[in-house]
Amino acid sequence: MLVTAQWLAAHLEDPDLVVVDLRWDEEGRGRARYEEGHVPGARFLDWATDLVDPDHELAFMLADPERFAAALERSGISDHSVVVAYADAGHSGPFRLWWGCGVYGHPDQICILDGGLEAWVGEGHALSGDVPNEPEGSWTPRPGTDLTATRADVLATRDDENAVLLDSREPDKFRGTTVWFETGAIAADADGVASTPRGSLRAGRVPWAVSVPWSRLYGPDLRMRSREELSALFASVGAAPGRRAITYCGVGISASALLYALKRAGIEQAALYDAGWDEWGRDPELPVARGG
């Protein structure tokens, strides 16, 4: 669930509460920014290294259950913990943690600070530079809910009247002028191909996908929109309770926030295509659309 800065301040001393800072930026300064100041008692968790499979051929794929559990345990998280995750407002790392916990059988464990660290500071709460020295937790992965979609699942949505495929990337990536890369967007050439440090990647989108940029999930204050507002947004793109939805982005990060928003709006038959554009754009056998 989403929690407010006021709620977090009132529960900061609860014995089962664990606060995790998932800030990340293209310059790799997440940990340094954490050390400069964070919610008192928060531990730092780097989703881009701690929660991913370092040996997978695709970037940022979800870690296996053992590696994922070890990362949570290093952050002091146990099965009984109430976890509040935050990042910069509008950033999707906390939603990635929420999704991973759901995949591994803890769908209700993660609370997300609505409005991010900006909400905490904006309401007058102090930051701390102290790094807590707390014991490790004990977190048990178990069979989870069906929150993951494959390439085959995405292909199956093409002719399914009861399914919709949603793309959470920014408009330039949906149109195919750039592709996402962790150090910054990379422009595509005249043939619609971007040269990335991991090789060539076609730009564009799955042809039948509908654009729902992650920024539309938030109000002007970068707090997530209400259930009613999200329901109206999703209805406008053909997503509604009783229909299946699959979300994707570049590597499954902003698509995690979109998945969360779908669930918040009561659309339960929803899953994340984790491989995302990093897989789709590299396979010449898969269709791609550009422009629009």
Task: List where the protein language model places each region.
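Thiolate-centered catalytic microenvironments shared by cysteine-dependent enzyme domains
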Residues: 59-160, 173, 177-178, 254-278
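Active-site neighborhoods of enzymes that stabilize oxyanions during catalysis
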Residues: 1-4, 10, 53, 117-207, ...
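Extended hydrophobic/aromatic segments used for targeting, binding, or gating
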Residues: 13, 268-292
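Active-site-surrounding "flap" and adjacent substrate/cofactor-binding loops of secreted or lumenal enzymes
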Residues: 37-40, 44
